[in-house]
């Protein structure tokens, strides 16, 4: 039985590597539950600020991360390859299956419950509260919670990096989304048509802020991924922008 499980795990890794999903690091152990309903409608919004995950391009392969993984929002947009740990609970795993999810939300601690009985997202547990359609790709519904093997992998996105202009008056709150490569952002700077480069501070989730009164100016961005790649995206936001508008660049991260 143990040989069969090890063989199945090896087969999954081999197939994933051949399909371009080869992970960069070793497997880690964690657990996973699900939320949001069969259509994942309950996963919209979230602590990363992506809003409607359907229109934002993230779909239903998403998850809320426990605080140890969420890292106060710095992990927003990262991708994780997850498979059920068949060596631990073969009866609750879909044999040979794996899924890649995007971190879009926080699964907060529940201090009223012990971490091994309901407080699944309590530190220091690495836990994924996955959108139900994603979870069902690797687990059997009746189980409710399963042990998993996971690791961070490269993100693949359709189209370029997106910038959504939030805020009001002299306060700009820029949502940076649809990030490929490492998936998450280390730093952002903005340059208006009549300004130099201005460093933005991360406010919450994937939202970056400045107080520079940039309305009426075309905007360029310098974005550095957590993978260490920096892109200069010039004039991606035209001078006629207004709050609430989203603009898609023609550039994308590779790492």
UniProtKB/Swiss-Prot annotation:
Q: Which InterPro entries match?
A: Expan_Lol_pI, Expansin, Expansin/allergen_DPBB_dom, Expansin_CBD, Expansin_CBD_sf, RlpA-like_DPBB, RlpA-like_sf
Q: What does this protein do?
A: May cause loosening and extension of plant cell walls by disrupting non-covalent bonding between cellulose microfibrils and matrix glucans. No enzymatic activity has been found. May be required for rapid internodal elongation in deepwater rice during submergence.
Write down the CDD domains for this protein, in alphabetical order.
Answer: DPBB_EXPA_N (cd22274)
* GO biological process terms, semicolon-separated: plant-type cell wall loosening
- SMART domains in alphabetical order: DPBB_1
Its domain of life reads: Eukaryota
UniProt keyword list: Cell wall, Cell wall biogenesis/degradation, Membrane, Secreted, Signal
Task: List the residue ranges forming a coiled coil, or say none.
Answer: none
Q: Where is the Expansin-like CBD domain?
A: 170-249
A Gene Ontology cellular-component term = extracellular region
Q: Which tissue types show expression of this protein? A: Expressed in panicles and flowers.
Membrane topology value: Peripheral membrane protein
Kindly report the protein's main subcellular placement as a broad class.
Answer: secreted
- Give the family per the record: Belongs to the expansin family. Expansin A subfamily.
Would you indicate the residue range of the signal peptide? Answer: 1-26
Question: Could you tell me what this protein is called?
Answer: Expansin-A25
């Amino acid at each position: 039985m143990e040989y069969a499980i090890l063989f199945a795990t090896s087969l999954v890794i081999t197939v994933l590597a051949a399909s371009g999903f080869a992970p960069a690091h070793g497997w880690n152990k964690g657990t996973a539950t699900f939320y949001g309903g069969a259509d994942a409608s309950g996963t919209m919004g979230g602590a990363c600020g992506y809003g409607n995950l359907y229109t934002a391009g993230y779909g239903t392969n998403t998850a809320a991360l426990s605080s140890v993984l969420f890292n106060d929002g710095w992990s927003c947009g990262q991708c994780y390859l997850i498979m059920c740990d068949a060596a631990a609970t073969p009866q609750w795993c879909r044999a040979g299956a794996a899924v890649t999810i995007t971190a879009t939300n926080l699964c907060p601690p529940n201090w009223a419950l012990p971490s091994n009985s309901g407080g699944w997202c309590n530190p220091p547990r690495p836990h994924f509260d996955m959108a139900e359609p994603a979870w069902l790709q690797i687990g059997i519904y009746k189980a409710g919670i399963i042990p998993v093997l996971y690791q961070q992998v490269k993100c693949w996105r359709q189209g370029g990096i997106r910038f959504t202009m939030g805020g009001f008056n002299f306060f700009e709150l820029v949502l940076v989304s649809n990030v490929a490569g490492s998936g998450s952002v280390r730093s952002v700077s903005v340059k208006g048509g009549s300004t130099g480069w201005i460093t933005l501070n991360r406010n919450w989730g994937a939202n970056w802020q400045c107080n520079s009164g940039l309305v009426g100016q075309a905007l360029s961005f310098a974005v550095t991924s957590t993978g260490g790649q920096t892109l200069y995206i010039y004039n991606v936001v035209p001078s006629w922008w207004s709050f609430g508008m989203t603009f898609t660049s023609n550039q994308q991260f590779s790492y």
